[in-house]
Design a protein with these regions (language model features):
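Bacterial N-terminal signal peptides
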Residues: 8-18
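Active-site rim segments in enzyme catalytic domains, especially the processed small/beta chain
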Residues: 74-99, 279-281, 420-489, 519, ...
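Bacterial N-terminal signal peptides that target proteins for export
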Residues: 1-8
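Short beta-strand scaffold segments in enzyme catalytic cores
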Residues: 80-81, 85-92, 409-414, 483-485, ...
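Internal maturation/activation junctions in enzymes
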Residues: 328-426, 440, 455-456, 574, ...
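Noncatalytic scaffold domains of N-terminal-nucleophile
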Residues: 21-49, 53, 61-255, 260-262, ...
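Short, small/polar residue-rich loop motifs at catalytic or cofactor-binding pockets
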Residues: 291-292, 405-408, 430, 479-481
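Extended C-terminal subregions enriched in glycine
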Residues: 475, 509-510, 518-584
Length: 618
């Protein structure tokens, strides 16, 4: 019973975490920060500032984004990481389009039925809270490869990582989000030695008594979790020091990727796995490699859309949905009108049905991407739906083939040379599997849940998958991460955009692009607008309801009025208000940068922690 409830609260918390990430200075996030030299946008003010400082010292956007990424691993522990993986989409100053896949890989000891319990039933707790849930991390390999291949050459890796090392070794003030998260997940952190040492301030007699009571079944699990959360240890502005993480970062700064995938850090990872029935071995770490992939490129009303291909499902789905939307006069529709939401929902259903069947790791499964992103295929798919009535998901199947992956973080950088970079990384759910590698100081991912195990099963975000995304050794799980670049009809960078939020990443990036291209909004104004989401299964429209916790943001909410909801219900649509008990009043957090008329404009999400420094220009 305890494990099942842990899973339930884990999922609810994933959807509610950012509801508490709200700073008092929110109005500033709605300004379009602008300047002429460069910009960085991320979920952490400290991380964005690190990137900008590197630019000021002569670095390019690639140097800046690597500094930002390593700093996020310290200052944003719920999603920033060195224990996870991600994707990069970039356009260099010379016009080269680059996409790098540093997604986690399944350990060689993994197998398709690894998350079945002794009774043969699928165990969410094994898939999310055990050491078996961890894939081989790729973030370190990816960031170092970006630095080596595309950095300016003006810095050493130690200089790039100095900000992250300083904040880990000497401490930094936590924001409201981290204070809330450390307390909210207390009952799970207490199950792990490393997490207890970092995230529990004082292992009090009250905590010990509660643990004894629940183990002896003298109090129910729900009461135990509630009482643990009611013990408030952390406040915004408290200082957190992460000495072991600092040591790990120093090893990486000195030895490059070998500072993580070999030597002392590798020893610590493997020892952690052996002690806790995990699967990652020395060979898995030694053999890990990031991979440059063929970019996914499409067009929308003359603009070029550059995104990530498989194992990301984001690029193919975004371009497929834009291809379908090109058949409608979107510019004439009011955003979030009944007509607009109905059209958008039908398009989303069609694309997510294809995601479930056709997409997976291209090294293992030949995904029919050319078919999925063709404009003819988009028109053919639209024949399955009606613009007058909702089409049940049961009536939508994946398209026939022509023979032949809540917790992420996105960060972007653009410089005056023309380099444009977007990176999305993840450890899957907030704080991953809540396990810290003892002695190494970093959280492990639970990305193995992003595989379809068993095929046909829904993951933590309700996404369903089949053979294309089944578990196999050294395979990379399918992802929803969608770093995307929009180029003008003349081929120049207009915007880099991405989001955090599991399956809702794709539809968030889509709606920002629509608002910029069809409605001529700035990246900030596009991010501000309320959003909706549908993904085939479950067959509902999710929308952003009124924020019960911070009413000052309700100028943007709800994304759908009661009148519009009733009108859409008459068309046959079903609904799920984001304002469920989890407190999730919004769907995802977007971050981006726009370059227009010789100026850089940052776009940061008020759904995040609301700090103006999330987006920095100079």
């Amino acid at each position: 019973m305890k494990k099942n409830l842990n899973y339930l609260f884990l999922i609810l918390a994933t959807f509610s975490l950012i509801a508490c990430e709200l700073g008092s200075d929110y109005t500033k996030t709605n300004q379009n920060l602008k300047n002429k030299n460069g910009a960085v946008s991320s979920t952490s003010s400290l991380a964005s500032a690190a990137g900008i400082d590197i630019m000021k010292k002569g670095g390019n956007a690639f140097d800046a984004i690597v500094a930002t990424g390593f700093t996020l691993a310290v200052t944003s522990p719920s999603n920033g990481n060195i224990g996870g993986g991600g994707f990069m989409v970039a356009r260099t100053a010379e016009g080269e389009i680059v996409t790098l896949d540093f997604r986690e890989k399944a350990p060689t000891l993994s197998y398709e039925t690894m998350f079945l319990d002794q009774e043969g039933n699928y165990s969410r707790n094994l898939a999310l809270l055990s050491h078996k849930s961890s894939g081989v991390p790729g973030t370190v390999d990816g960031l170092i490869r970006i630095f080596n291949d595309y950095g300016s050459g003006n810095f050493t890796l130690d200089e790039i990582m100095s900000y992250a090392i300083d904040y880990a070794e000497n401490g930094h003030a936590i924001n409201k989000s981290s204070a809330w998260g450390f307390d909210f997940y207390k009952h799970l952190f207490l199950e792990d030695k490393g997490s207890t040492e970092i995230f529990i301030k004082n292992y009090s007699l009250e905590m010990r008594q509660l643990q004894e009571d629940v183990q002896n079944e003298t109090i129910p699990e729900e009461e135990y979790i509630k009482k643990m959360r009611d013990i408030k240890e952390w406040n915004e502005g408290d200082i957190i020091v992460q000495k072991d993480l600092a040591k790990t970062l120093k090893r990486i700064a000195t030895n490059g990727r070998d500072g993580f995938y070999r030597g002392e850090t590798a020893d610590l990872i493997v020892n952690e796995m052996k002690a806790n029935n995990g699967l990652i071995t020395y060979e898995d770490l030694k053999d890990y490699n990031s991979v440059y992939r063929k970019p996914i490129v499409g067009s929308y009303r003359g603009y070029s859309i550059v995104s990530m291909g498989p194992p990301s499902s984001g690029g193919p789905l975004i371009i497929q949905m834009l291809n379908m939307l090109e058949n409608f006069d979107v510019a004439s529709m009011t955003r979030n009108s009944t007509e607009f939401v109905h059209m958008l929902t039908e398009v989303q259903r069609l694309a997510y049905a294809d995601r479930a069947i056709h997409l997976g790791d291209p090294d293992f499964y030949p995904s029919p991407v050319p078919m999925l992103i063709s404009k003819d295929y988009a028109k053919k798919r639209l024949e399955l739906v009606s613009m007058d009535m909702a089409t049940p998901s049961t009536d939508i199947a994946a398209g026939s083939t022509i023979p032949e992956s809540m917790e992420t973080t996105h960060y972007s950088a653009m410089d005056k040379l023309g380099n444009t970079v977007g990176i999305t990384t993840t450890i899957n759910l907030s704080y991953g599997n809540k396990k810290i590698v003892d002695g190494a100081g970093f959280l492990l991912n639970n990305e193995m849940d992003d595989f379809a195990s068993p095929p046909g099963n829904q993951n933590a975000f309700g996404l369903i998958g089949y053979e294309a995304n089944s578990i196999k050794p050294a395979k990379r799980p399918l992802s929803s991460m969608s770093p995307t670049i929009v180029l003008t009809p003349e081929g120049e960078p207009l915007m880099t955009i991405g989001a955090a939020g599991g399956s809702r990443i794709i539809t968030t990036v889509l709606q920002v692009i629509i608002s910029v291209v069809d409605h001529n909004l700035s990246v900030q104004d596009a991010i501000n607008l309320g959003r909706t989401h549908s993904q085939w299964i479950p067959d509902v429209i999710r929308y952003e309801g009124k924020n019960k916790m911070n009413t000052e943001f309700n100028q943007f909410l709800p994304s759908l009025s009661e009148k519009k909801i009733n009108e859409l219900k008459k068309l046959g649509h079903k609904f799920e208000d984001g304002n469920v008990e989890s407190g999730m009043y919004y769907l995802a957090r977007a971050h981006g940068i726009m370059y227009k008329n010789g100026q850089f404009f940052t776009g940061v999400d008020w759904r995040g922690n609301g700090e103006i420094s999330d987006g920095v220009t100079y």
